[in-house]
């Protein structure tokens, strides 16, 4: 994509033209990925890096924290017409605990996902998920 396209996507996200962010998390086996471009299987692990990469836009002042959270949670739930995306009495308690300023280097070998392939290998980011809860139960906690 061109730099103009990249900037237009960020502007669209910031002003609400783009409603939601999705990772399209599609883990791929290393052998299936390490092929010439044409025959290589499409996909990459994304769930391990989604929050930190989105927080990059927040830290750079390109979108607000509120807008990022809306695009990652409330908007997808609304688009799909499913409950969720907010914390409310009697609702599903699906949420994450994270440290927005915690710095780390993306290293696929450390992913919890089934795949360790990432186009962001060795990329410095900020934002670390400490725990993920689904229906109020911890499904992931960082050691």
Where are these regions (language model features)?
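Active-site glycine- and acidic-residue-rich loops that bind
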Residues: 1-10, 79-80
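C-terminal cap of metal-dependent C-N hydrolases
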Residues: 36, 92-143
